[in-house]
């Protein structure tokens, strides 16, 4: 049985154009204008495979309807020609050369020759005289999908070669090889793996695509000015077609993710054992976020997802989940094809994540045999209780093993799960016998782990100075991929409710501020956000009451303009903290809340574990949760201070709903 394998090589051809004066291959019935002494000949040999799953049609992704050759000398256009096919479906072409070009094609001039497929250069739409302008031609081909999954137009493709042409010699007429690549990129979402307890799928999953760039330049990586994004409507993932695909021209987006492409997936889910007509549509947002924040020509952005939480019932506010994204050259070859005679090495993927697993397999493709893996190491990076960033290197059995299977073309990585509550960063180098190499990076996450960023200032410390005896500006992030086996922890974003803060004058109340606080019920108290951040010590407080109010029904909380007089609920409602992002911009975080009881207990458990390396996160004796009756006791042996069940410390938290490591959970509704 034929199986398709994705291939990414140094020169990954979609199709090779073999251009030459083919004396032994010229047919006797070629039309009269094809003269062996005055024509260039070329052979188009398409590789008709694509990066696809079995049973999926090719969607005209390799179809060539017309070819245009454009010749440039020193950046100026000198000639344009359309190759003529010698006979239908022969893939053999010739290019008659007019006598006016013989003086140019004399063996002394070097030409940059561009081959363009499926672009209709006619009338006023001619290749520009300037080579720079030609490469910035706005491609007219539409990539928006029709009902059959094919784009409205055939794919524009481009390739080039540099050559000195000499019409006086046979060798001088051979232009060599041209690699032809699509101008557009392909984005594919595979059918999801469903792993939600007590729920099952009804019907086919559907997905649509947002922030498609509908226009692009022929061979320049820029977004065209004045061209807006398009949205492509839902398409189903059926049994016959276990994925959906979309296309886009070059796109790039800023660190704030404006313009980032994304899939929106709809699943109809029902409770196990109930009728199909009880199923409801749940919506998920799946960002396509490559490390370089670009969608590049002739690349396949292949997304796989596992669904472990309920989505949103609101299509306009879908739950964000992060899938496994592979970015590879958009081409493939089946096992029974002969690969071109080129040198290459590719490992897929080069960067990936191992969540709660001790083994992973990577695919590799190499023109030559591989050498043993080199530079295998594993590290972990964390911030200790003194605010110092530490990187430890693993030794002994904690160093991963990397093995290569030349028969299956697999690289197997085995690594013991970290027990120190910190992700393990694995790296190694793969080389082949001719010196090509790939550096591999893998992050291995345990079921619960801690990462961090750093705060710079806060509403409590607007100058950015820590209070006396404090030294840690780390904003710790707690990530829960899987709850403990005891079954007592409920994973999900804790629900919140809106409340008002008032000033009272006589018998009248003036609303000064509204905000959202953690729900104050027992079910919420047992919940743990799948990903939440704790305010740094820039937000450390003295002991406070839980709340102050004028009335309970309706709830009217007391407003204090002086933060030194505030209570726990108000402290988190009004708290903000800033940090510097990777691009140097400042991010202000102002969506804080009181933690749940279970979240405080989880942090306390992690900081007390003997193997853990992040300790002393919450060091007071008691901390307020969302429950008003009494504060939560910290079991850390070194906990100190004057906090009690009724007057306790405050450590605000915030949910991280667009997490780069963990699938986000649905915010539970009241």
From Swiss-Prot:
UniProt keyword terms in alphabetical order? Cell outer membrane, Fimbrium, Lipoprotein, Membrane, Palmitate, Signal, Virulence
Q: Mostly located where? A: other
One Gene Ontology term of the molecular function aspect:
host cell extracellular matrix binding
Give residues with lipid attachment (S-diacylglycerol cysteine). 25
Determine the domain of life of the protein's source.
Bacteria
Please state which protein family the record places this protein in: Belongs to the FimD family.
Which named protein is this? Major fimbrium tip subunit FimD
């Amino acid at each position: 049985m034929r199986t398709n394998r994705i291939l990414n090589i140094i020169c990954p051809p979609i199709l090779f154009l073999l251009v030459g004066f083919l004396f032994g291959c010229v047919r006797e019935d070629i039309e009269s204008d094809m003269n062996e002494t005055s024509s260039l000949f070329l052979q188009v040999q398409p590789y008709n495979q694509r990066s696809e799953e079995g049973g999926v049609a090719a969607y005209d992704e390799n179809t060539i309807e017309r070819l245009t050759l454009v010749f440039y000398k020193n950046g100026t256009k000198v000639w344009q020609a359309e190759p003529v096919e010698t006979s239908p479906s022969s893939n053999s072409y010739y290019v008659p050369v007019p006598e006016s070009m013989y003086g140019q094609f004399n063996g002394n001039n070097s030409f940059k020759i561009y081959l363009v497929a499926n672009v209709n250069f006619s009338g006023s739409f001619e290749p520009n005289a300037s080579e720079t302008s030609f490469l910035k031609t706005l491609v007219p081909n539409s990539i928006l999908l029709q009902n059959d999954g094919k784009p409205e137009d055939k794919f524009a493709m481009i390739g080039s070669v540099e050559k000195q042409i000499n019409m006086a010699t046979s060798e001088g007429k051979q232009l060599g090889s041209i690699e032809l690549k699509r101008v557009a990129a392909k984005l594919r979402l595979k059918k999801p793996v469903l792993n939600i307890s007590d729920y099952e799928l009804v019907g086919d999953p559907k997905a649509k695509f947002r922030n498609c760039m509908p226009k692009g330049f022929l061979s320049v990586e820029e977004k065209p000015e004045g061209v807006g994004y398009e949205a492509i409507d839902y398409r189903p993932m059926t049994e016959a077609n276990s994925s959906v695909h979309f296309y886009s021209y070059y796109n790039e987006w800023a660190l704030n993710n404006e313009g980032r492409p994304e899939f929106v997936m709809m699943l109809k889910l029902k409770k196990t054992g109930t009728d199909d007509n009880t199923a409801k549509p749940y919506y998920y947002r799946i960002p396509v976020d490559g490390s370089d924040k670009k969608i590049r020509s002739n690349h396949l952005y292949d997304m796989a997802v596992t669904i472990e939480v309920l989505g949103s019932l609101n299509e306009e506010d879908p739950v964000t989940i992060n899938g496994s994204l592979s970015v590879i050259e958009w081409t493939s070859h089946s096992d029974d094809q002969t690969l071109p005679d080129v040198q290459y090495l590719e490992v897929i993927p080069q960067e990936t994540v191992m969540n709660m697993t001790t083994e992973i397999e990577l695919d590799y493709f190499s023109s030559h045999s591989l050498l043993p893996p080199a530079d295998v190491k594993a590290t972990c990076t964390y911030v200790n209780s003194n605010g110092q960033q530490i990187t430890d290197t693993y030794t002994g059995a904690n160093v991963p093993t990397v093995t290569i299977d030349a028969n299956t073309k697999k690289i197997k990585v085995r690594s013991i799960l970290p027990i120190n509550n910190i992700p393990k960063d694995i790296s190694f180098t793969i080389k082949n016998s001719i010196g090509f190499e790939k550096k591999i990076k893998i992050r291995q996450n345990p079921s619960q782990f801690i990462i961090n960023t750093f705060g710079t200032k806060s509403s409590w410390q607007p100058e950015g100075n820590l209070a006396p005896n404090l030294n840690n500006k780390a904003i710790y992030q707690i990530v829960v991929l899987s709850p403990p086996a005891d079954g007592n922890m409920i994973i999900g974003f804790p629900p919140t409710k809106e409340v008002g803060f008032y000033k009272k004058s006589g018998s009248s109340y003036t609303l000064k501020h509204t905000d959202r606080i953690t729900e104050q019920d027992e079910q919420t108290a047992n919940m743990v956000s799948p990903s939440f951040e704790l305010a740094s010590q820039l937000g450390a407080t003295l002991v406070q009451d839980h709340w102050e109010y004028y009335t309970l029904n309706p709830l009217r909380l007391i407003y204090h303009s002086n933060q030194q007089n505030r209570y726990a609920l108000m402290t988190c409602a009004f708290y903000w903290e800033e940090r510097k992002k990777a691009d140097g911009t400042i991010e202000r975080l102002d969506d804080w809340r009181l933690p749940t009881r279970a979240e405080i207990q989880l942090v306390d458990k992690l900081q007390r574990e003997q193997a853990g390396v992040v300790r002393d996160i919450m060091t007071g004796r008691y901390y307020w949760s969302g429950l008003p009756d009494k504060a939560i006791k910290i079991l850390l042996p070194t906990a100190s201070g004057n906090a009690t069940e009724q007057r306790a410390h405050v450590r605000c938290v915030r949910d991280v709903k667009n997490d780069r490591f963990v699938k986000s959970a649905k915010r539970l509704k009241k």
